[in-house]
Amino acid sequence: SMKTVVLKFGGTSVGSIERIKKVCKIISSYKKKKNKVVVISSAMSGVTNELVNKSKLISNNFDKAEYDTLLSTGEQVSCALIAGRLNHIGFKSRSWLSWQIPIITEGPHSAARINRVVSKELQNYLKTGGIPVITGFQGINSNYRLTTIGRSGSDATAIMLAKFIKADECIIYTDVDGVYTTDPRQYKNAKKIKKIFYDEMLEMASLGSKVMQPTSVQDAKLNKIDIQVKSSFVSKPGTLITNSSKVFSDQIITGISSTKNDAKITIEGVKDRPGVAASIFKPLSQNLINVDMVVQNISLNGKETDLTFTIKSDDLKKAEKFIKQNKKISYKKLSFDKD
């Protein structure tokens, strides 16, 4: 049977005409596999900032509704270019602006939430084999004014569309090829995580994982949408963010290398429950101990987890004390590895 796939492309993925052509190749590869394909695009990188600057030159107290009207033009440009390119390379495609679907939002300008997506026309268009290219980051409110969804609004758009059209897959293309234990742009020994639960992802996001905003992960969790995070720059497998434990039988990742200033701490046999990682890391961060890389291996029985993370060597004694004092966690073994 036909799969429905939602593909979302971030600003750097559509940041130039060359990149847009590359993105259209990616889109066409999904379409050739006989999928129904829905595309969500952000504005070309840099464009939104230019628009923000223009508004500041007009007034440092720029009208909020006009601000959203101004900003929403960014995605209109990228979606028209993508749809135009798809047509050029032989695929039926058209752009859909948020108000044409419509995507209905509630809440204040610049921080609206998507309430519902009226998807009937869109579904009909998908049945004809067309590829809709939809503006991320925006919608219309009950007064028919354009609204924007705040940070990472395009992810929210993708997740809500996936929900309302009952998509089989939601794939978020970005400039990193998945979720890493720490920012791969800063640490070359960051490890990619193949599969991660929403709850762990929420903890990772607060640990500075730049891949997805916590609100988007929360949306995905609430609506039970599995998300694949991939890079549009390299064709490598990404990270699956999911809630189904069936995918967890294979061990996620094993081992992180500790560097000369880092110490590695492994806590084995931690009783696995939602938020367990947070209850370990919170006291550490409150005491200014920076947790750098986190690796979690769920045990085969699914009830326990092994947690490995790195901290600065100087913090080792302090960290050990906080873990041992922590009444919220039970574990079997605590070990340290210092280079």
Language model: regions and residue ranges:
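Structural preference for solvent-exposed beta-strand-turn elements
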Residues: 161, 167, 219-225, 229, ...
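Acidic, glycine-rich loop-and-beta core segments that form the ion-binding/anion-interacting portion
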Residues: 186-191, 196, 206, 216, ...
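Conserved beta-strand termini and adjacent loop/short-helix elements that scaffold enzyme active sites
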Residues: 96-98, 230-232, 294
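Electropositive, surface-exposed helix/loop patches at the edges of structured domains
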Residues: 126-141, 204-228, 263-265, 269-273, ...
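Nucleotide/pyrophosphate-binding catalytic subdomain
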Residues: 1-217, 297
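Terminal amphipathic helices with adjacent charged low-complexity linkers/tails
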Residues: 41-48, 180, 229-246, 303-305, ...
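Short hydrophobic alpha-helical runs that function as membrane-insertion/retention elements
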Residues: 169-173, 227-229, 292
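A conserved regulatory-domain signal marking ACT and ACT-like small-molecule sensing domains
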Residues: 240-339
